[in-house]
Structures are given as structure tokens and as C-alpha cells.
């Protein structure tokens, strides 16, 4: 499976390479399969992206890799090792949304106000470039101390997440914790 992105693929996708993007995962994670992006569009209007590695670009339906992944259904995380659903080169390198590497993604993009009102949304194929990898602990420390790399972006995402969570509970969502 070639790791290079064909030139014609860029033309088919929305370009998010210059949008602030980062991953937040466990400290021992190797496969960064999702990322968040955020940019201010204008006063009180933000564009938030949830990006998932586009494995379908590399694994065609019905292929040997696809059939094996379907059998496995998920990666298995054991204490001493991981049994990946996909070949290691694919999940830990080609499709891993590692910092400073251009990657293909399938993305949900939301335009929302500071009050969490979603004004527009779309699901699109994108090309992204993650700016940084955070562990859960690093992101939490930025939220608590309001200091660190990309603090404005992380704090805005945290604020929007809390507003959206409150709206869900007000609308009747159940918390199972």
C-alpha cells in the first residue's frame, strides 16, 4: 500500500492543512485515528472539524485486508500488546494522523456560534495536517491551567463541548456514569 497521496486526490478533497488541528489520545497510543480542528470564521462563529482517518482510500471493499478487518471487527488492546484490526503499517503509519504529516480524512465539519448553535454542518473528504499530538493528561492540564500549546483552541473546544453537553441533557439525554 503506497503511503504517498496522489496529486489528483488533493483536488477531490477540502483542504484543511492550514487549519489548526490536533489529536488527543492515550499516552501509549500509536494509531491516531481521529483529530479535532478549529478556526474562527468571524465574531462568534467557529468552524469545528472532527476528522477520522480515511482508511477507505487505501482499503477497497472486498479486498483481503477488508475481509480480515471485517472478521476482526476491532483492534484488541491487551496489557502487553495490541492486536490491530488492520495491518500495522496502515493503522500506525499510513492512516495515523501523526503531527506534521499530510493525511486523508473523512470529516464532520460544523459551523457554530459561541453559544453552541450549529448553523451549518457537512461531511466531507479532506486532507489534513495535524499540528500536535496531545495526551489526555496534557489536554486536561491545559484546560485546568489555561496554559500551554494551542490553549485558545483547546479552551474554545472545551467550552463548546460543555455547552453542547448541557443542551443534550436539557433535551433528555441520559448520563450513565
Which residues fall in each region the model found?
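Electropositive polyanion-binding surfaces
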Residues: 1-177
